[in-house]
Amino acid sequence: MKQTTSTAARESGSALAQMAQRLPLSDAHFRRISQLIYQRAGIVLAAHKREMVYNRLVRRLRLLGIHDFGDYLALLESDPHSAEWQAFINALTTNLTAFFREAHHFPILAEHARSRPGNYSVWSTAASTGEEPYSIAITLGDALGERAGSCQVWASDIDTQVLEKAEAGIYRHEDLRTLTPIQMQRYFLRGTGPHQGLVRVRQELAARVNFQPLNLLAAEWALPGPFDAIFCRNVMIYFDKPTQERILRRFVPLLKPGGLLFAGHSENFSQISRDFYLRGQTVYGLTKEK
């Protein structure tokens, strides 16, 4: 058995090596890929991302039976409306997320929601697999009680594959380690039998979160704003400064008076845009209301 496993491993490694030899990623092809993902999604690919790009896109080539990156690029550019464009974008987007990531934001959100009348609404601009918008909805549920039933979280992402996972609302139990036992019981169902070790979002929580595909570079955003709060965390780091400025400018009319904009720990929106000022740790308000 050990010999068989070792042989299989060698064959697998050999196959990967052969694939790399058959499918070289030239400098010209990498530059074109970088241009296309920037045009379509605003993502800036640094030179050190080349290996990541290769590893992700080579899967698409294998699936399509294409043996040259030039042929793949020709396929993309032959039809600007091809479904392969979405697969291309999905492959090159990065999705790092967790429940209650950057935890200091959520007490601020809770206090803000309690202080405001009416139906509280939030936009999560990069929902990924759902951990952020569900964390927002849980926070509102805990903070507002019965009033949370009228709150809405709008959750968007450019990657359609991660949105499917988000809508399914199924996670590993270990992914919820930042939740309290009460939150676990109140907002999730535990899997049994073949689903042991998994949890699913309860319908009451899922009903407050609306998922939709959205490209921040799109000319129009089909959103029901303005919002009491916008979460745009760890998104701008993938864009260049002109793109960052354009997006932040478009956030201004989408925030209600007194609204909050939440950023990632490595992002400084007040250095990018004069429209926002720093109210707290990576939390921004509108400068015109300062």
Curated annotation (Swiss-Prot):
Q: Establish whether keyword Methyltransferase is in the entry.
A: yes
User: Is the keyword DNA-binding in the record?
Assistant: no
> For this protein, what reaction is catalysed?
L-glutamyl-[protein] + S-adenosyl-L-methionine = [protein]-L-glutamate 5-O-methyl ester + S-adenosyl-L-homocysteine
Question: Any idea where the CheR-type methyltransferase domain is?
Answer: 18-289
The membrane spanning regions, by residue number, are none
| Molecular function (Gene Ontology), one example | protein-glutamate O-methyltransferase activity
- InterPro entries per UniProt: Bact_Chemotaxis_MeTrfase, Chemotaxis_MeTrfase_CheR, CheR_C, CheR_MeTrfase, CheR_N, CheR_N_sf, SAM-dependent_MTases_sf
Q: Which residues take part in binding S-adenosyl-L-methionine? A: 95, 97, 101, 132, 157, 215-216, 233-234
What EC number(s) would the UniProt record show? 2.1.1.80
Biological process terms in GO annotation: chemotaxis; methylation
EC class of the enzyme, as a word: transferase
Q: Which UniProt keywords apply?
A: Chemotaxis, Methyltransferase, S-adenosyl-L-methionine, Transferase
Function of the molecule = Methylation of the membrane-bound methyl-accepting chemotaxis proteins (MCP) to form gamma-glutamyl methyl ester residues in MCP.
Q: What is this protein called?
A: Chemotaxis protein methyltransferase
Q: Which gene encodes it?
A: cheR
